[in-house]
Amino acid sequence: MKKVQKTLAMLLAAMMLLALAACGGPAPAPTEPPPADTSGDTPPADDGVVVPEEGASLKLWFDNDNYNEKIVELWNAKYPDIPLTVENVGTTDSRTKIELDGPTGMGADVFVQAHDGVAISAQSGNILEIDLFSDEIRSEFVENAINAVSYDGKIYAFPLSMKTIVMFYNKALVDTPVDTWAEMKEFAAEFNDPAQNKFACLWQAVEPYYAHGFLGGYGYDLFGPTHDDPDQLGWDSAEAAEGLAFYKTLQEDVYPVASADATWDAMNTMFSSGAAPYVITGPWSIADFTNAGIDFGIAPLPKMDNGVRPKTLSTVDTVCVSAYTQYPKAAMLLAQFIATDPDCLQLLYETRNELSASIEGQKLDFYANDPFMSSIAVAVNDALPQPYIPEMSNVWAPYQKAVIAVWDGLQTPEEALAAASEEFYSSLVVTE
């Protein structure tokens, strides 16, 4: 019996040695690693550095020739091995152009568009999620701009610049700008001479982008309190009607012209010639007025009869990466470069008079020392970010019809807004 036990013990010991040898034996021969994923979904390296694809070359669409020429020089200085070409394509045209040119391989890798196109482009699959830099965008840009480039909880663009409308005044004609529309009406009663085409204040009066603030200032919430619910258009609200009714008084007492005459050209010509004391426009007019030699200032829009200033819409220009790019990492690096590099932001300021959407960018000396940009920054922070849901594109046409009908005295605010609301919801059914 003892002999059997001894034999079993020896067998068990041998088996244990074999098992240990198997565990501690040489590793299997290495296999070929899988190819690197170069798609836009690839996370950055552990050190946070995004490495562009080998052999990358890029195309950018933007709408300013002076900017386009110099941005290539700045890019080449930092990324000499990634050729960049730039084509002049408008920010209002780039979304539809990428839909056509992207699938053919003729589109840009990176393009700039207004933020109301971001949700549409994301929904239709024409732009990439900026997943490589989403944390950076959420922490380094102003909140309104972050919301403007977000869709379904994801980031789809770099915010570039922020804009809204303000009141410009000619210092040769105005000592101290008015602070209320009641004061403006008193000034207009003395200044206006329609026969001589003299008006106290001019603006693109029947463009909803300009008119909306007066409705917003009376408490109207476009698409509800969070501005993202297409079922809460709100044109049937008392606040919307009250705001539009006040707006009509400006046609009667400040700018008594037909809607067809309240144009950009009229505003720009009269102020640039020194004939108009006040105009309502945005930072895009600074260069024209400066080149015209006008000594002007910028002030907030006057308070309405309820003691509140118009709640204007702010817009954000955004830098998007095409879903059709062959080089998503390089393209995202270009988008980041355009939106955050101090030299690029200075170029944006010098060529377009635009305010950066970057928190640190707004602190750069050339912004901080410019009183016009400081005024724009205050106005932008007080403005309502233009709703960024796809249904926003269905708002403009009926909204303008309502404003024109009231401005020209063809309908009451309630009638005009009811007709506009019906057209809006009918258009959603068609697009679905």
List where the protein language model places each region.
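Conserved N-terminal structural module of periplasmic/extracytoplasmic solute-binding proteins
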Residues: A9, L20-A119, D135, D305-G307, ...
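Extracytoplasmic/periplasmic substrate-binding proteins
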Residues: E73-N76, V118, A245-Y327
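Extracytoplasmic "Venus flytrap"/periplasmic binding protein-like
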Residues: L74-F141, S150, K154-Y156, A172-D179, ...
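A structural signal for short loop-to-beta-strand junctions that line the ligand-binding cleft
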Residues: L100-D101, A108-D109, I137-K171, F199-W203, ...
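Periplasmic solute-binding protein
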Residues: V118-N126, E143-A182, Q204-D229, L313-S322, ...
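Glycine-centered hinge/linker elements that transmit conformational signals in sensory
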Residues: F187-A188, D229-A260
